[in-house]
Amino acid sequence: MSGTIPHFWAQPFRYIRWSAREKPAYFYSCVIAGLGPVFLTVVPPVRKYFGDVNPAPIPVTYPIPTGPRKQLTGYDDDTEEA
């Protein structure tokens, strides 16, 4: 184990190496978080290059049929006039 903990602003590369060994969860979570903005700019063109398209949106309403509706008979509906 090293003697003293390096300070980030004094020795940034030494601090990064130290944190990768001593606190890997924090180190790799910062690495993944730092790659987020890069992925936002790189991934969409790569998806488009490989032909991946977004799926059609899921319908949120029932489609209304076109044309007139059929009048039902024989189900005790003759009391209601449309």
Swiss-Prot record:
It is found in: Mitochondrion inner membrane. It comes from Neurospora crassa (strain ATCC 24698 / 74-OR23-1A / CBS 708.71 / DSM 1257 / FGSC 987). Belongs to the complex I NDUFA3 subunit family. The gene is nuo9.5. Complex I is composed of about 40 different subunits. One of its GO terms (cellular component) is mitochondrial inner membrane. Accessory subunit of the mitochondrial membrane respiratory chain NADH dehydrogenase (Complex I), that is believed not to be involved in catalysis. Complex I functions in the transfer of electrons from NADH to the respiratory chain. The immediate electron acceptor for the enzyme is believed to be ubiquinone. This subunit binds ubiquinone. It is a single-pass membrane protein. Keywords: Electron transport, Membrane, Mitochondrion, Mitochondrion inner membrane, Respiratory chain, Transmembrane, Transmembrane helix, Transport. Its main location: mitochondrion. This is NADH-ubiquinone oxidoreductase 9.5 kDa subunit.
